[in-house]
Every structure is written in C-alpha cells, then in structure tokens.
Regions:
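A generic "cationic amphipathic patch" detector
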Residues: 38-39, 74, 98, 105, ...
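Histidine-/acidic-rich catalytic cores in large beta-rich domains
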Residues: 22, 119-120, 207
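Active-site catalytic loop in hydrolytic enzyme cores
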Residues: 76-149, 164-165, 172
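Active-site-proximal beta-strand/loop segments in catalytic clefts of secreted hydrolases
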Residues: 28-30, 71-74, 101, 133, ...
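Cys-nucleophile CN-hydrolase/nitrilase-fold catalytic domain and related Cys-dependent amidase chemistry
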Residues: 3-91, 172
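Structural motif
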Residues: 23-24, 127-129, 153
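Short, flexible loop segments at the rims of nucleotide/cofactor-binding pockets, characterized by
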Residues: 2-5, 45-48, 106-111, 130-135, ...
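CN hydrolase (nitrilase-like) catalytic-core segments centered on the catalytic cysteine
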Residues: 49-69, 137-215
Length: 215
C-alpha cells in the first residue's frame, strides 16, 4: 500500500512535465522515501518497495521516450545501503548508476548507507552526464574526477540546495547543471554559471530547453 501510494503520487506529479515532451527528467534525492518514517520503518519500507518504483519509472521512460534520473536508496547484497542515482534511457534500460560519494554522518551511522567511490560520467543519447547527490556538492575531489571527463550536464539530486556552489560547479566544469531539490528551488544553470531557469513558490518544477551544441 505504501509503495502504491508513492507510485500514484509520482504518476500525478509527472503529468506536470510530460506534456512538454522532455528528453530528460531529473528527480530529487531519495525521491521515493517517506521522510517522516523512523529508520527501522524506513528499512521495512525498502524491503516491501523492492524495485517497484524503479520499474515504474523505467516504464514511464519507455512510454514517453525520455531519460529519467531516479534517485533512491538501494539495498546491496551484503545488507548495506547506497544512496544512488540510476539513469534510465528512453528504452527503459538502466544505463548507469552513481552512488553518493559523500553521505552525511546521519546516513552512515543511522541508515547504514555507505559511500560510493566512483565518479564516472554516464553516456546518454544526448551526451554525457555527471551525477552528484546532496553534500557531494561541497567536496572538490569528486568534481576534479569529473572535470577531465567533460560532462555535458551535471545532474544534482538533493535535499540541500547549496546556493552559489551550484553555479560554481557548473562554471568550473563548463557544464550545464540541473538541480532537483526537495521542497526548494530547482534550477537550470548554463556552463558559465548563470541560472537560466528555476522553479517558483507556485510551481515546484521547471522545464527548459538547453543547447548542447554550443561548443
């Protein structure tokens, strides 16, 4: 029932952006979690949820011929967890997974979420994307790994806005930056660090066209 409610909620929310026929939808950090749940109940929910929400987004990506950046907690075979962004292509396939490199102390100590160690760009039909989650925004080593890979777009799923660090990372990597933030301003930033689109207090989503042929 909890999983059904979550899927129904996202099905309604996606109707705000799907009429614009997007090539890419970026979802906020841990987008299918009930944030008011204590840790034990949260872990019970993950067991019941399994991959059902992921499969829902895979079906949506396929039916609407778009990429979806799906951020969620994943349980690993050893019983530990990762805070991950999974990139789904228009054929409904997972083409890459990024594990948050810099989880918070609360995540590691309470939720048993371990840090990822890789920072590899993921190839999509339109170009290369670099993923980052929440506090990753503040740690230079991650971004120095990404810089020589020349990503076209940075996908930032977060519960934390980060302020001007968003613009700085876009400028430093000379990359577009898309910020999808829980209950805060969502942004599209160009490769020179200018915010070119953002959500408002009236609408919690933003759609925008960007030109990846500018180089």
């Amino acid at each position: 029932l909890e999983t059904d409610r979550m899927i129904d909620s996202w099905n309604r929310l996606l109707q705000n952006v799907l009429p614009n026929e997007p090539n890419l939808i970026v979802l906020p950090e841990i987008c299918d979690q009930y944030y008011n749940y204590p840790v034990p109940r949260r872990h019970e929910y993950y067991e019941v949820r399994g991959n059902r929400v992921r499969d829902f987004f895979m079906e949506k990506a396929y039916k609407n011929s778009c990429h979806i950046a799906y951020s969620a907690v994943r349980k690993m075979d050893d019983g530990t967890f990762r805070n991950s962004t999974q990139i789904i292509n228009p054929r409904g396939e997972i083409v890459g997974i990024y594990n948050k490199n810099h989880p918070t102390i609360g995540e590691t100590e309470e939720d048993n979420i371990l840090p990822g160690k890789d920072a590899k760009v993921i190839s999509c039909d339109f170009g290369k994307v670099a993923c980052a989650i929440c506090f990753d925004l503040n740690f230079d080593p991650l971004w120095e790994k990404y810089k020589p890979q020349s990503p076209d777009i940075i996908l930032f799923s977060s519960a934390y806005h980060g302020g001007l660090m968003q613009n700085y990372r876009a400028y430093r990597l000379r990359s577009y930056f898309i910020g999808s933030i829980i209950d805060l301003e969502n942004t599209v930033i160009n490769p020179v660090g200018q915010t070119i689109a953002k959500s408002t207090n009236y609408f919690g989503y933003v759609t925008h066209d960007i030109n990846l042929d500018y180089k």
